[in-house]
Amino acid sequence: MRAISVWGLLVLFVLLVIVFSLLRPDTFLTYFNIRSILSNKSVQLLVALSVFIPMVANQFDLSAGYNVGISQVLAIGLQGQGLPWWAAVCAVLLMGAAVGLANGLLITRVKIDSFIATLGTGTILYGLNAWYTGGQQVLASLPPEFRAISGSIWIAPAPAIYALVVSLILWVVFEFLPLGRYLYVLGASPRAAELNGISAKRYITFAFIAAGMLASFAGIVLQSQLQVGQSSVGQEYLLPAFTAALLGATSIRPGRVNVWGTVLAVAVLAVTVAGLSQLGAPFFVEPLFNGSMLILAVGLAVQAAQRRQRRGVLAENAEAAGATAAPVVE
């Protein structure tokens, strides 16, 4: 049973690939289709990893999708106004960091709940995006260097390489470095973190800054793919991102959000949507599927967290019983 909960998403991913390959042998498991999935869904993975970071500390970033939206617009708009491509990229990343800082300060200093704070900042970003674009497409001549951001590295799509590198970095941070452990402690027990001298204000703010920059980077990659700015693009990445992060909490490290669980969840969602599309499913199936998966992911994540908590309580009780039963040596 433990193995099923740990590797369930991986098994599901393999089964989905096999099923869709059998149903569409000529089109599904082809280089073109695999490359298309990797390229298109790598942006989704970057957004999912951005919401994963504060979620470790039991905080939620609802501004991520709006951040992606305004970032992809600014990435082309600033270049259209004469800024070099690298300066535009740096400016967008700094904007993302500023959004994350604002979120962190609202949550840790003003004591606004993360749902409300990030929903508010996200709505502000949406309004600024609409004001900047005037509701129109933003067009500009993009240099080859910027377009190459979404090109290829060897035979792999560059966005997939970025997503893999970011995943590896976050895995190292959250599994092996004090910063990651502190954020997990803050998510599990803020009181215990306080007693151990862990500054909630500092680390939660840092988590939101990192999340904001990563969401902005996803917007930059997206703009390199689209090569046209649209104010309506970006928000649609939020729901699948939360679905992936929560669904990932049921696998690899059941009961807690984790990097590779999130990666597997994005892979499962991507393969399912691509497979259904090749089977001729209508356009509205994807949002129906994403919404259903979000509800399922929340339910499974809650159950996994409860099982993890029960195992911890049982282990503590067993340890206490062992200590009580120990013979007294006179």
Give residue ranges: language-model regions:
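Cytosolic-side transmembrane-helix boundaries in multi-pass membrane proteins
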Residues: 1-18, 168, 194-202, 274-330
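Short loop segments and helix-boundary regions at transmembrane helix junctions
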Residues: 1-2, 60, 80, 97-139, ...
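Hydrophobic core segments of alpha-helical transmembrane domains in multi-pass membrane transport
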Residues: 9-21, 50-51, 122-129, 162-173, ...
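Structural signal for alpha-helical transmembrane segments and their membrane-water exit/capping regions
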Residues: 14-29, 57, 129-137, 172-178
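Single transmembrane alpha-helix segments in multi-pass membrane proteins
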Residues: 15-23, 27-81, 105-112, 245, ...
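Helix-loop-helix "hairpin" substructures at the membrane interface of multi-pass membrane proteins
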Residues: 84-92, 98-103, 107, 154-229
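Transmembrane helix-bundle core of multi-pass membrane transporters
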Residues: 110, 114-177, 203-206, 225-234, ...
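Transmembrane alpha-helical segments in multi-pass inner-membrane proteins
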Residues: 215, 225-291
